[in-house]
Amino acid sequence: MPKVIGLTGGIASGKSTVSELLSAHGFKIVDADIASRQAVEKGTKGLERVKESFGEQAIDENGEMNRAYVGEVVFNQPEKRLELNEIVHPIVREIMEKEKAQYLSEGYHVIMDIPLLFENNLQDTVDEVWLVYTSESIQIDRLMERNNISMEEAKARVYSQISIDKKRRMADHEIDNRDTKLELKQNLENLLLEEGYIESHSEDVL
């Protein structure tokens, strides 16, 4: 029986890497970030509603969403973040549910890759939750390097989410990403073996 697994983790925890590894093992990935971009692509009703809510500046010269502008607005105005979520979330859910149903009908196990799964109370929409976690200091370092932001900004983004300790208590399974990519792969494959998804480790993990 195909399973639906919610994959989540703190910001900059390495969740995308785990998604790639799971895809290589034959899981089908339904990615919330990709669906969020599709929801406001050029010419969509979603983007038209963003324009109505955020004004002409929300659209760039190419007719696409001005992510820098919208991002700045929602960061500084919490009520605008709620407004954006009310526009985007229903469209994202529709895109993801359609994709999930297609994969399940084909007999695949499905990974619902949702960064804010717990924050949006979506744990009941999946069979179980797998959490990718790392240390807070690693999260902050990765964010500073990846997004070219200050330590204060990185900390603010980390602290804006539910704490990793609380998420660990809420998850069904954990995937430790505090060390190297090879060790991450080993930790993931240990879980896949325990749960019966694979029969042996990859050659580079042995």
Curated annotation (Swiss-Prot):
Source species, domain of life: Bacteria
Gene Ontology annotations for the cellular component aspect, listed alphabetically: cytoplasm
This enzyme's EC code(s): 2.7.1.24
Residue ranges of domain DPCK in the record: 4-204
Catalyses which reaction(s): 3'-dephospho-CoA + ATP = ADP + CoA + H(+)
CDD domains on file: DPCK
GO molecular function, one term: ATP binding
InterPro entries: Depp_CoAkinase, P-loop_NTPase
Annotated pathway: Cofactor biosynthesis; coenzyme A biosynthesis; CoA from (R)-pantothenate: step 5/5
Places the protein is found: Cytoplasm
Gene Ontology BP, a term: coenzyme A biosynthetic process
Positions annotated to bind ATP: A12, S13, G14, K15, S16, T17
Record key words, sorted: ATP-binding, Coenzyme A biosynthesis, Cytoplasm, Kinase, Nucleotide-binding, Transferase
Family from the record: Belongs to the CoaE family.
Function, in words: Catalyzes the phosphorylation of the 3'-hydroxyl group of dephosphocoenzyme A to form coenzyme A.
Family matches, as PANTHER family: BIFUNCTIONAL COENZYME A SYNTHASE-RELATED, DEPHOSPHO-COA KINASE-RELATED
Protein name: Dephospho-CoA kinase
Taxonomic source organism: Staphylococcus saprophyticus subsp. saprophyticus (strain ATCC 15305 / DSM 20229 / NCIMB 8711 / NCTC 7292 / S-41)
